[in-house]
C-alpha cells in the first residue's frame, strides 16, 4: 500500500494541503501532512528526516511517496537522498535550485547583478514576513484559476517566518548543492517533477536544473502559477 507524505513551503504549514485532503480520502489514499520546523535551517533538515522516519516506523508495511511543494520540495529531495531506496517515489512541485556557479555569459543573459539580488532578497523577506499587501502576494502565488475563497482561506493560515530563517534560506544555495553532490535517489521512474509555466517565484531554469540533476521525469502545466497545481481544480 502506498503512503503519501506531504511537505509544505515557506510562509505556510501543512494547512496548505487541506485543499486536496477530500480527494485523498475519496480515493482511500493513505497520507501524512508534515509541519516542518522552520525555526532554523538545521532544524528544518532535522525535522524533515525525523518526521519521515517516524511515519515509516508507524507504518512499516507501506511504500512511501514523498511530495514537496516549493521549498518543501527541496526537503523532500534531501530526505530521498538520505534514505535512498527506502523511498518508493519522490514528487516535487514548483521547486527549483540554482547551481553553485553560473557561467558569466549566463549571468549576463539573466541580467543578474548584486543590486538586483539585494532587491530580490529584500522583497522576498518582506513577502514571507507578511509585510507586503495581500493583493500583491496573491498575484505572486496564484492565477485566476484558483478560486478567491481558497486564496482567502489559505491566507488565514499563513505564517510569518523569522528573519533569521529567511536569511539562512536565501543564502543556502551552496548547502543544497552540497547535499546533491552524490545522488542516491534519481531516475525518471523514481522522481516526478511538476511545474507551472506562470510561476513568478521559482525560475524555470532552476526547476530544469533539478530535473537534470535527478534525471527526473517532468510535466509543465501551461498557465499555472506557483500554487495553482495544488489549489485549482483545473490542474
Regions flagged by a language model, labelled:
Residues 200-206:
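Conserved alpha/beta-hydrolase "acid-adjacent" motif
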Residues 90-122, 165, 171-172:
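Flexible "cap/lid" loop of the alpha/beta hydrolase fold
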Residues 68-72, 76:
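Gly/Ala-rich beta-loop-alpha elbow adjacent to hydrolase catalytic centers
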Residues 127-170:
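Conserved alpha/beta-hydrolase catalytic His-Asp/Glu region
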Residues 2-41:
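Conserved HGGG/HGGXW glycine-rich cap/lid loop of the alpha/beta-hydrolase fold
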Residues 187, 193-195:
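Short beta-strand/loop motif that positions the catalytic acidic residue
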Residues 224-234:
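Catalytic histidine-centered segment of alpha/beta-hydrolase-like enzymes
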Residues 33-64:
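Active-site loop/oxyanion-hole signature of alpha/beta-hydrolase fold enzymes
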Amino acid at each position: 500500500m502506498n503512503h503519501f507524505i506531504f511537505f509544505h513551503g515557506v510562509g505556510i504549514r501543512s494547512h496548505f494541503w487541506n485543499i486536496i485532503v477530500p480527494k485523498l480520502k475519496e480515493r482511500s489514499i493513505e497520507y501524512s501532512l508534515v509541519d516542518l520546523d522552520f525555526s532554523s535551517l538545521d532544524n528544518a533538515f532535522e525535522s524533515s528526516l525525523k518526521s519521515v522516519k517516524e511515519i515509516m516506523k508507524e507504518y512499516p508495511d507501506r511504500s512511501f511517496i514523498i511530495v514537496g511543494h516549493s521549498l518543501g520540495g527541496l526537503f523532500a529531495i534531501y530526505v530521498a537522498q538520505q534514505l535512498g531506496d527506502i523511498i518508493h517515489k519522490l514528487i516535487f512541485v514548483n521547486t527549483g535550485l540554482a547551481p553553485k556557479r553560473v557561467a558569466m555569459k549566463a549571468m549576463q543573459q539573466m541580467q543578474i547583478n548584486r543590486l538586483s539580488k539585494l532587491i530580490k532578497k529584500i522583497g522576498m523577506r518582506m513577502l514571507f514576513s507578511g509585510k507586503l499587501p495581500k493583493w500583491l502576494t496573491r498575484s505572486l502565488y496564484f492565477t485566476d484559476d484558483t478560486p478567491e475563497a481558497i486564496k482567502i482561506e489559505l491566507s488565514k493560515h499563513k505564517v510569518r517566518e523569522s528573519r533569521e530563517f529567511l536569511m539562512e534560506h536565501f543564502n543556502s544555495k551552496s548547502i543544497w548543492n552540497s547535499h546533491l553532490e552524490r545522488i542516491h535517489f534519481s531516475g525518471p521512474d523514481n522522481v516526478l517533477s511538476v511545474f507551472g509555466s506562470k510561476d513568478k517565484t521559482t525560475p524555470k531554469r532552476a526547476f530544469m536544473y533539478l530535473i537534470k540533476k535527478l534525471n527526473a521525469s517532468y510535466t509543465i502545466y501551461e498557465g499555472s502559477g506557483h500554487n495553482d497545481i495544488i489549489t485549482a481544480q483545473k490542474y
